[in-house]
A protein has these predicted regions:
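The feature marks the mature, well-folded catalytic cores of soluble enzymes
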Residues: 1-166
Length: 166
């Protein structure tokens, strides 16, 4: 940790190779880091921006469904992913939530239902009905277990019911 700016260029595989026409988007990230003028690192693992949320003080929120998905980095387990986060973004602590909401084709991106609103505050969606209620309750329970350890304030936000267009 020298305090100097640098970038991390994670690999992008279109959310587990779901969209062949978007696989080329990985090149866009390479162009961004190259044109930024700052040194950059390439860990060589798949990670999309919405798969993690960081509080700025070394704490990451993520889901097992996303980062441990075999369509991303089948050769990595939880411990190895934590090592990458510690090494490349100086985040030694990770709160692993279970999974994301139904119908999310990104395989459980955290940014669909939980975010840091400050370094010590987490907003998390909840629903008392519908298909997302059980997983949101499970994720809330995991946050509750972690809040004292990390000194977090938790706030629930109601998740609206899905709207389907015909």
């Amino acid at each position: 940790d020298t305090g100097r700016k640098a970038a991390v260029k994670w690999d992008f595989n279109a959310w587990g190779a779901k969209y062949d026409d978007l696989l080329y988007d990985d090149i866009a990230g390479q162009h961004v880091v190259e044109s930024s003028g700052v040194p950059y690192f390439k860990p060589g693992i798949v990670m999309e921006g919405g798969s993690i949320d960081v509080n700025g003080n070394g704490l990451v929120l993520t889901t097992e469904q996303c980062l441990l998905n075999r369509n991303r980095n089948p050769h990595l387990d939880r411990g190895r992913i934590e090592e990458y986060l510690k090494q490349y973004i100086a985040a030694p602590d990770v709160i692993w939530l279970a999974s994301g909401i139904e119908g999310d084709d990104t395989d459980g991106h955290i940014d669909d239902f939980a975010r840091f609103s400050s370094a010590s505050s987490v907003l998390c969606a909840f629903s008392d009905k519908g298909e997302n209620a059980p997983v949101l309750e499970r994720n809330w329970s995991l946050l509750e277990k972690a809040k004292d350890r990390f000194g977090l304030e938790l706030q629930r936000l109601p998740m609206p019911e899905p709207l389907y267009l015909e």
